[in-house]
Design a protein with these regions (language model features):
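Short, well-ordered alpha-helical microsegments
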Residues: 16-18, 80, 100-102
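Donor/substrate-binding cores of folate-linked one-carbon enzymes
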Residues: 25-29, 90-209
Length: 289
């Protein structure tokens, strides 16, 4: 029954594409995809479709099927009418990057499943993966929950813990791992959700923590701090490695030396000492140190 239920998938970036790919591999094919519009990317500003759109376009082309793709700039009345016409049983949301209003959440018959790459109620918000790395956590995880009008707030259907070594694992690797686990948890949860036999648990608001969206400025590391870490200041070395790992690839870690910007692409700690591995000076290609 669960595989026959109609659902719409909301998601835009790489994390969402990995989740969606896992769902498709598990036999859960969305009726439609909702993602952000195509955007100009890179120095040449080439208009590029989001990763989820690319995935669905490739799937539709190779499987002779037609998954509708909706890319609203705003979740307005016209978009809501399009969704209602699809008559979905439920929604799945993974890193959609827009606040979804009640008027949209009220459309599906069964409600909306959200997936969030943290152990809710910890690390709610825009940057859970970056934030756990920056904080030096040793455990993180992923959560499947019932979405409501508040951010990452609804009752929890399932969670899975994932051990974490922030001195080894960078953002890209952790994102991949958590997205794959999220897809697996969704595949386990959806049948129970559709059949009405899931047992969600209320989040403990007293334990809620929140994350923020990071900018380029958050990735700046004073060169004096870098120098001290290379000289053996282990506390500074660990923080710098965590910063590089958290902001790989975006917004990136960087420093300024002699008035020139240097991107810090890869580093590690050895015996409490910072070892830079890969850097990139402005106007040059990346190189090993």
């Amino acid at each position: 029954m669960a595989n026959n239920a109609k659902f719409v998938f909301f998601g835009t970036p790489r994390f969402a594409a990995i989740v969606l790919d896992g769902l498709i591999a598990g036999g859960f094919i969305p009726t439609a995809l909702v993602c952000n519009p195509d955007r100009p990317l890179g120095r040449k500003k080439i208009v590029t479709p989001p990763p989820t759109k690319q995935l669905i376009a490739e799937y539709s082309a190779t499987h002779a099927t037609d998954v509708a793709i909706l890319q609203p700039e705003k979740l307005d009345d016209a978009f809501i009418a399009q969704l209602r016409a699809l008559r979905p049983d439920f929604f799945v949301v993974a890193a959609y990057a827009k606040i979804i209003p009640n008027a949209v959440l009220a459309i599906p018959r069964l409600g909306t499943l959200g997936t969030h790459p943290s152990l809710l109620p910890l690390y709610r918000g825009a940057s859970p993966i970056q934030s756990v790395i920056l904080a030096g956590e040793t455990v993180t995880g992923t959560t499947i929950y019932r979405m409501d009008e508040k951010m990452d707030h609804g009752d929890i259907f399932a969670q899975e813990k994932v051990p974490l070594d922030v001195l080894i694992t960078n953002y890209s690797a952790l994102e991949m791992q958590l997205a794959k686990r999220s897809a697996w948890l969704l595949i386990k949860t959806i049948p129970l959700f559709v059949d009405g036999i899931a047992s969600p648990q209320v989040q403990d608001e007293s334990h809620a923590t929140f994350t923020k969206k990071f900018t380029t400025e958050n990735g700046f590391i004073e060169y004096s701090e870098l120098d001290a870490a290379i000289a053996g200041a282990s506390d500074k070395a660990e923080l710098i490695v965590r910063t590089i790992h958290a902001f790989d690839p975006e917004p990136g870690a960087w420093t300024i030396k002699d008035g020139k910007r240097i991107k810090l692409l890869e580093a590690r700690m050895a015996d409490g000492v910072l070892k830079l591995i890969t850097i990139q000076r402005d106007g040059e290609t990346a190189r090993n140190v």
